[in-house]
Amino acid sequence: MTDAASVATRIRRAYEDFLSGGNPPADAVRSIVRDSWARSLTGGVDPSDATPNGDRASTMSPAEFAAYRAAHPITAVRPLVQSLMVDAIADTGVVVALTDQSGRLLWIEGDSAARDRAGHIDFVEGSVWSEEVVGTNAPGLALAVDRSVQVVGPEHFAGPVQEWSCAAAPVHDPLTGHVIGVIDVTGGREVAAPFALAAVRSVVAAVEREAAGEVAPRRRLAILI
């Protein structure tokens, strides 16, 4: 058994132990994941269901979603994300997602086959992937703890999502410091590698630098006025 397979087996056993009411060993699963599992369970997330409760259909019409997405501040960074990341992963089995501050998926781009597969778990534009809605996952956890995170296979709370791995990091407004959304990479085993999280962090850093550069002249003008 490879090291990766051994780790996955250990995590899966811890997950099953946790769901059955047990207390997995501290070294069986990362504390950030264990805490997220606990919040997911307490919040009533069904571990057997990966569908985000029909939220995209119940709260926004297609026209409302299109208008909301177009006006959302994270949409302004989409061209930079495309040039830094999306173009490079076109046929790699990976997708890149941009969410809003609530975990709603605003844009999903990348490998078309991977997008089709992701649709089976409702990882589609318009659906909500917050921790409260779908349980432990990288976009939702990044929003919950306001830091970059990687969630690998059986670390996901919803069983149907456990064939996927994801890495995500929050994007902050340069003026307020508030989180405006998340940049996420989702795929298979390749996203379980450390470089996936490093790549997301690098892209978010570039996005926040560019946003800060655009804000600086407005700050100086405000001071002069």
Give each language-model segment a name.
Residues 101, 145, 153-155, 169, ...:
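Fold-independent oxyanion-binding glycine-rich loops
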